[in-house]
Amino acid sequence: MRKYETIFILNPSFDEETVKANIEKFKGVIENGGGTVENVDFWGKRKLAYEISKVSEGFYTLVNFTANPELPRELDRIFRITDGVIRHIIVNEQV
C-alpha cells in the first residue's frame, strides 16, 4: 500500500449538496477499491490562478489516502468522466 494525495476542483456553479455528493462519490471509489481515506480537507470556493474553460473559481478539495498502485489509475478515470471536475491531480506522497 502506498500513500497518495489528490486535489480536485469542482465547478463553482454546483450547490453545496452536489459538492458534498461528489466528494462522497470519490471517497467511495477509494474505499471500494481497497484503499483507506486518511484525510479530507475541503477548502471551499477559491479563485483559480487562471481561467479554465471560462471559469475563474472552483471548489477545492484535498484528499490523502492509502491504496494499491492500481487505484489511482481508476480514480483518474472517474475524475475524467465526471461532469463538473475542472482539474485534478493525484500524486504519490514520498515517505
UniProtKB/Swiss-Prot annotation:
One of its GO terms (molecular function) is structural constituent of ribosome. It holds the Pfam family Ribosomal_S6. Gene3D superfamilies: 3.30.70.60. CDD domains: bS6. SUPFAM superfamilies: Ribosomal protein S6 (SSF54995). InterPro entries: Ribosomal_bS6, Ribosomal_bS6_sf, Ribosomal_S6_plastid/chlpt, Transl_elong_EF1B/ribsomal_bS6. GO terms for cellular component: cytoplasm; ribonucleoprotein complex; ribosome. One of its GO terms (biological process) is translation. Keywords: Ribonucleoprotein, Ribosomal protein, RNA-binding, rRNA-binding. It comes from the Bacteria. Coiled coil: none annotated. Belongs to the bacterial ribosomal protein bS6 family. HAMAP family: Ribosomal_bS6. Binds together with bS18 to 16S ribosomal RNA. This is Small ribosomal subunit protein bS6. It comes from Clostridium beijerinckii (strain ATCC 51743 / NCIMB 8052) (Clostridium acetobutylicum). The gene is rpsF.
